[in-house]
Amino acid sequence: MQTIEVRRDSGQADEDSIVAFERGAGIRFPESYRELLLAHDAPRLKCPDFKFVDRSSGLFTIRDVAFFGFGSSLSRSNRIVDAQDSDGCWHEHIVVFGTCANGDYVCFDYRRDPTANEPAVALMFHDYPDNDGKMLVNLVADSFDEFLSLLHRAP
């Protein structure tokens, strides 16, 4: 995993909490994601911005990421377990791991292979539906490591 500068965090995530979430969701997180959260639960990064192609416009767009965490002392709005779909607006096999300042979601996309341990990273618009009435999903990176390589400080 490449070096990521963390501005602040909520301590270290507990391995048992990560494993319990994986079992409950029927997924396996990428190893580099696990390493990051085991070192920095709910990290806020010094360079949190990334660029992607907005499927609704075809234009490059910039968003930021604030990671959810696993700690029981975190507020519900910062806990990964409380951030998962509860109203049926998300596609199956999408696991949200972060949010953007505007309310969009950064997620692992397991739709191609629910058993993958290196899923794609996507951005899900919270206020823009696709043709099925689900939140529109935009591919950001083919893996978590590639996603980390896209992170930069906004100009």
Protein language model features and the residues they cover:
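N-terminal leader/targeting signatures
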Residues: 63-66, 121, 140
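A surface-exposed partner-binding patch
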Residues: 1-104, 152-155
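Glycine-rich, aromatic-bearing surface loops/beta-hairpins
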Residues: 131-149, 153
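Intrinsically disordered, low-complexity segments enriched in small/polar residues
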Residues: 31, 103, 108, 142-145
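Segments surrounding the PLD/"HKD" phosphodiesterase catalytic module and close analogs
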Residues: 108-136
